[in-house]
């Protein structure tokens, strides 16, 4: 929490000391996920689809430029609650195209291909282009390959923070708040470096399982793939992902998880109530009570840790999630 407050403070400082030399020159042309956009001025009625997109904009101090947000798996960061309260919420779930258009947007940015793209349940980018509205998709999701039959695709190499920095820099340029963007990026870089230094001597290259959720106790586990943000967290903490699938969000049987025998199990904390095992305490209860799963060494040794579920997505919360797990590892003497 302290690091997030520091991050927010840095952005506030950037408001006071913004360098006019770095101001955006309009028209601004940007390329994003194969699309070229031109902005003649900063958007005034943006719609953020996805929690990460919304929180990036709020951290950049853009609440007055936001017409609405949608799709929130967890509550907003506490230090952003006041700003967020000033922005219309369409829904915490998947919005309709009609509800988005009703806000009269002049820019639509999305976190996930589920919310914007050729296979989206909401809209294709062409739906907005035809109306003269620019759209944007998180670069972290553009980097996945759509070859798995899953909307999130697969990732050929380990995700890293550079893709998040690209997104922050793009948003800062679009809205002409570059100094704030630079402050955010520098804060993240310092925090990642500190974690890597702390866990550089981690012994044994421990394997991590990142369990997001399951529809029911009898269902397979929905987990972070090898090269996903979860894999990045494992890497930062001196280990590796126990899941070898390159799919971004594979569903894996418990038989396969038992065979992988992870050293550490990280369970997602979610505020939504979509699936039976969304809540962290329900996941922990399952791990400890299932006859087979409870025999995993990680379970018997108590190496089960809770992390913000949004951190398992490639978001501004990913590093925060790494910090959460790091604190629990240190408390257990596993760093």
Please identify what each model-predicted range represents.
Residues 155-167, 266-335:
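Structured C-terminal subdomain patch of bacterial secreted/periplasmic proteins
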Residues 30-34, 87-98, 246-254:
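Short helix-initiation/N-cap motifs at beta->coil->alpha
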Residues 48-118:
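A short, structured surface patch at a secondary-structure boundary
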Residues 115-123, 133-170, 203-229:
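Extracytoplasmic ligand-binding site segments that recognize negatively charged/polar headgroups
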């Amino acid at each position: 929490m302290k690091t997030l407050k520091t991050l927010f403070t840095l952005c506030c400082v950037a408001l006071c000391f913004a360098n006019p030399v770095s101001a955006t020159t309009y028209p601004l042309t940007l390329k994003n996920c194969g699309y070229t956009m031109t902005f003649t001025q900063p958007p005034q009625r943006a719609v953020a689809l996805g929690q990460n997109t919304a929180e990036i904009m709020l951290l950049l101090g853009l609440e007055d430029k936001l017409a609405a947000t949608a799709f929130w798996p967890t509550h907003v960061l506490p230090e952003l609650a006041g700003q967020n309260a000033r922005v219309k919420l369409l829904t915490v779930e998947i919005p309709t195209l009609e509800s988005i258009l009703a806000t009269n947007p002049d820019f639509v940015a999305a976190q996930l291909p589920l919310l914007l793209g050729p296979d989206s349940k909401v809209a294709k980018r062409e739906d907005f282009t035809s109306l003269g509205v620019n759209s944007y998709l998180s670069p972290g999701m553009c980097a996945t390959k759509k070859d798995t039959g899953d909307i999130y695709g697969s990732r050929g190499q380990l995700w890293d923070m550079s893709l998040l920095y690209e997104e922050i820099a793009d948003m800062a340029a679009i809205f002409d708040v570059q100094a704030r963007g630079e402050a955010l990026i520098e804060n993240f870089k310092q925090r990642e470096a500190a974690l890597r230094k702390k866990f550089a001597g981690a012994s044994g290259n421990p394997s991590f399982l990142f369990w997001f959720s399951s529809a029911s106790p009898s269902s397979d586990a929905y987990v972070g793939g090898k090269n996903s943000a979860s894999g990045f967290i494992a890497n930062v903490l001196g280990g590796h992902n126990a899941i070898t699938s390159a799919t971004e969000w594979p569903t894996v049987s418990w038989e396969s998880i038992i065979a992988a025998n992870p050293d550490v199990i990280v369970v997602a904390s979610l505020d939504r109530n979509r699936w039976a095992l969304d809540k962290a305490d329900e996941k922990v209860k399952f791990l400890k009570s299932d006859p087979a799963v409870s025999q995993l060494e990680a379970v018997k040794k108590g190496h089960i840790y809770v992390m913000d579920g949004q951190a398992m997505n490639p978001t501004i919360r990913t590093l925060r999630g790494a910090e959460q797990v790091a604190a629990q590892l240190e408390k257990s003497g596993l760093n």
